[in-house]
A protein has these predicted regions:
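Membrane-embedded alpha-helical segments in integral membrane proteins
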Residues: 3-11, 129
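Hydrophobic residues within membrane-embedded alpha-helical segments of Major Facilitator Superfamily
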Residues: 3-4, 37, 116, 151
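Small-residue-enriched core segments of transmembrane alpha-helices in multipass membrane transport
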Residues: 1-6, 87, 149
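Juxtamembrane and boundary regions of transmembrane helices in multi-pass small-molecule transporters
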Residues: 94-166
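Hydrophobic residues within alpha-helical transmembrane segments
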Residues: 2, 63, 67, 105-108, ...
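Hydrophobic alpha-helical membrane segments of integral membrane proteins
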Residues: 1, 77-84, 104, 116-120
Length: 166
């Protein structure tokens, strides 16, 4: 942005417009919250609770995917996956499960869960910002959830009972 401004391609307002966009600030804040979740030990506590109830592979897949998906609805998809990977590896080691079977479900659930709320996925925020700039209104915070939550539930059940075989 600085180079484009100094070379005269963009005005200062155009070059730095993205840095003051509320979506950019919100996106940065989500990464901070995700890091705090891990640093405070909440991630480990969640892993211990999941480990207590997950007695077989199918239940563990459902628990991991639902937890990841719900977290992803309110935090960054990438940040959620990054936080959940070490948690799931720890759960698998503690429970004697093969960790390679549980890493892809994290990514799937984070992607699906991102559609629960406005802040779950950067694409949701960008679409909303574009609607507002065009003067077409905006989505409510949970507008995406009408499709996103059922998609997370159905996707989780599909993966737990059918998809894990492939």
């Amino acid at each position: 942005a600085v180079g484009l401004h100094l070379s005269g391609v963009l005005t200062a307002a155009e070059a730095f417009k993205g840095f003051v966009d509320s979506n950019v600030i919100l996106f940065i804040a989500m990464f901070i919250i995700g890091a705090a979740f891990f640093e405070t030990g909440v991630a480990v506590d969640v892993g211990n609770v999941v480990n207590k109830f997950a007695k077989n592979e199918t239940i563990l897949i459902i628990a991991i995917m639902m937890l990841t998906g719900i977290m992803s609805g309110f935090l960054s998809n990438t940040g959620t996956a990054a936080v959940m990977i070490p948690v799931v590896i720890g759960i698998c080691k503690k429970g004697g499960f093969n960790q390679t079977k549980f890493l892809m479900p994290i990514v799937f659930a984070a992607a699906m869960g991102g559609n629960i709320s406005m802040i779950g996925s950067p694409g949701n925020m960008i679409a909303n910002s574009n609607l507002q700039e065009a003067g077409l209104g905006s989505f409510s915070f949970f507008a995406y959830g009408e499709v996103g939550l059922p998609m997370l539930i159905v996707g989780t059940l599909f993966y737990a009972f059918i998809g894990k075989r492939f």
